[in-house]
Amino acid sequence: MTLLSLFKNTNNNNPHTLIWGGDDFLNDYLANSYIKEDQFKDLEHVSVDCENDGLDELIASLTESSLFSENKLILIKNPFFLTAKVPKKLKKQMDDLQKIFDNLNELEDVVVIVASYDKLDRRKKLTKTVLKQFNVVEPTIRSYEVGVVVKSLIKAEGYTITQSALQLLIERSDQVIDTILSNYQKLKMAASDNKITEKSVMQNVDLSLAQNIFAILEAALNKNYQ
């Protein structure tokens, strides 16, 4: 099981993938897991940040051959070209990207886009093309789904966690998925035989801010009544 399979995929047989949602930490976590899959281990991995590197660098990565292997895996971050915030001076680059994504099936490389935006400009032709040509994954997690998703994610990565440990992890993370994943990283490093126990959570995950405040208030109240 892959982590992306925990969420709705529009075409999970298509390696070209768009991970789209407002949670950048979760998106990056899923993307990093995906590109490390065995099917991509022989590809040269290239990462392009559109905001820092620019669209010319992206186009070059998409059109130039790899120097180190037959094919590449191109990870695209901050793809502002899918939003409404594209300067008019970049029209040529937008046209070039349109041609590339129109003919994505001819591209021997694998393209993974991480779009950490709440909204994309669906009116734009380029956005429509990407949504059509890519396997689109929207990793949204409702509050009541946190426990099930986290447990499934942990299982997919080859770890086990007791129900009491899972509940404690969620509580100490204030039920925030980014914090849960961050704390889970600590637990993986400390896990013996890939097993996460309640004792491990207590030893490696601090009380949440809310729990600390509650403990301070409780201690103060107890002191007043003594």
What are these regions (language model features)?
Residues G22:
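P-loop (Walker A) phosphate-binding loop of NTP-binding proteins
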Residues T2-K8, N14, F25-N222:
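Non-catalytic interfacial helical region
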Residues I19:
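Hydrophobic anchor at the beta1->P-loop junction of P-loop NTPases
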